[in-house]
C-alpha cells in the first residue's frame, strides 16, 4: 500500500461531546498530515428561525482552536439534513477524510451509532472515521 495522503478533512460538527472528541482527533490528524479542516454543520434539521449566523456561533470556538494550532480551516453550513449536508460538503470541498462523532445531539442518544454517522458511513465516497 502507498503512503496515506490526507489534504482535506471534513469534520461533521454539532457541538456534542462526541463531536468535540472528533474535533480533537481531526486536529491531531491535520497537524500530522499538514491537512486543512472543513468544519461542517448542516442546519436543515433545525427550526426555520435558525440562521446561518447562529450556526457560526456554534462552530466559531472550534474554528478558533484550529486556527490557534496553525490549521487552515474553512466552514461549510449546508442547508440540508445533517448526513446529506456532510456528504455534499465532502464532495464539494473534495475531502480526503470525513470525521464525525458517533452520536450527536439527537433525541436517541442511547443508540449504538447515531443515524447521521450511520448514513455518512453508508454513503460516503471517501474514508470515514467515527469517534466515540
Q: Where do the protein language model's features map onto the residues?
A:
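Gly/Ser-rich helix-loop-strand patches that form or flank binding pockets
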Residues: 89-132
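Conserved beta-strand termini and adjacent loop/short-helix elements that scaffold enzyme active sites
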Residues: 40-42, 76-80, 131
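Proline-centered helix-kink/hinge sites
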Residues: 39, 82, 125-127
